[in-house]
Amino acid sequence: MEEKEQVDLNQLLNAIKSLTLQEIKIFTDKLQDELGISSDNLYSSRGILTESTSHNKEVEEIDEKTEFDIILEEVPSSSRITVIKVIRSITNSGLKEAKEFIEALPKTVKEGISKEEAESVKAQLEESGAKVTLR
């Protein structure tokens, strides 16, 4: 910044400092109108969170989740055989392990998998009749 610009800014600062609070309020309102800036934008750009912006931040954090766990909640008796087959293919386990797996529910089928894989596994289990949740 050139020396002349620095002097002009210092003069502007001194002029603003000499204003009363009421004059500063009027000045900032006019400045916001002139520049098309709202006070909401000022607060969020400074990192001051209002209730609505903090809520939006929480929603974004939830949306950013990248790893999911598949929890097998319930298997109806009429769907046991089909669910056992799906569990065997998903977990690469034997018949005995898959059968024991569905007897002690709820149980985690897969942990830390991508959203796409989680949705695929969930769809397979639900198609076979199981009740599944994603976490």
Curated annotation (Swiss-Prot):
Arranged from A to Z, the UniProt key words for this protein are: Chloroplast, Plastid, Ribonucleoprotein, Ribosomal protein
Q: Which family does it belong to?
A: Belongs to the bacterial ribosomal protein bL12 family.
Q: Pfam families given for it?
A: Ribosomal_L12
- The lineage's top-level taxon is Eukaryota
Described by its record, this protein's role is as follows:
Forms part of the ribosomal stalk which helps the ribosome interact with GTP-bound translation factors. Is thus essential for accurate translation.
Q: Name one GO biological process term.
A: translation
Recorded hits in CDD domains, A to Z, give: Ribosomal_L7_L12 (cd00387)
**Protein's recorded name:** Large ribosomal subunit protein bL12c
Gene3D superfamilies hit by this protein: 3.30.1390.10
Please provide one cellular component term from the Gene Ontology annotations of this protein. ribosome
